[in-house]
């Protein structure tokens, strides 16, 4: 059975979204494990940037501050796929030694190249709320 252009467009978008969710999971696990080399592989081969709280990093090694009891979790992913480009906005939750530390928002750009999805830019803006009010239990 032949698919229409619209059916193929929707299917490709869904496949891209699923792959980007997997990219996020891998990125978070590598960050939490303190695996700098692995974490960097979630970004495009060259030209990727990372911005945290307004500070831009073009050398991703200098941006890395994971591991050492830190756990990064992302939720509420809003992903838009357009061919080989995609954008994402999601919520970041940061835990240290299993205690909630901070929440924020990632705004990401992705590219499909070399058979997979990668971050081209990742911008993290932390929320400006006191720690004890950020995640009521």
Language model segments and positions:
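Short, low-complexity N-terminal intrinsically disordered segments enriched in polar/charged residues
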Residues: 1-33, 37-42
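C-terminal-biased regions
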Residues: 2-6, 71-80, 125-128, 135
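Conserved aromatic-histidine-acidic binding/catalytic patches
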Residues: 12-15, 67, 98
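Short solvent-exposed loop/turn micro-motifs enriched in small/polar/acidic residues
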Residues: 22, 70-72, 101-103
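A solvent-exposed, acidic/Ser-Thr-rich amphipathic alpha-helical stretch
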Residues: 30-94
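Surface-exposed coil/turn segments at beta-strand junctions on protein surfaces, enriched
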Residues: 81, 99-101, 112
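Short beta-strand edge/turn micro-motifs at domain boundaries
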Residues: 87, 103-137
């Amino acid at each position: 059975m032949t698919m229409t252009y619209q059916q193929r467009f929707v299917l490709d978008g869904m496949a891209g979204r699923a792959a980007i969710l997997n990219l996020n999971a891998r990125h978070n696990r590598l960050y939490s494990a303190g695996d700098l080399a692995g974490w960097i592989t979630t970004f495009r081969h060259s030209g990727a940037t990372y911005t945290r709280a307004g500070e831009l990093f073009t050398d991703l090694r200098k941006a890395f501050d994971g591991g050492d009891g830190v756990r990064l979790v992302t939720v509420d992913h809003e992903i838009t796929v357009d061919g080989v480009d995609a954008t994402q906005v999601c919520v970041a939750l940061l835990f240290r030694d299993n205690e909630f530390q901070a929440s924020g928002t990632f705004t990401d750009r992705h590219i499909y190249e070399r058979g997979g999805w990668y971050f081209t830019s990742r911008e993290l803006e932390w929320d400006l709320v006191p720690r004890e009010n950020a995640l009521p239990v």
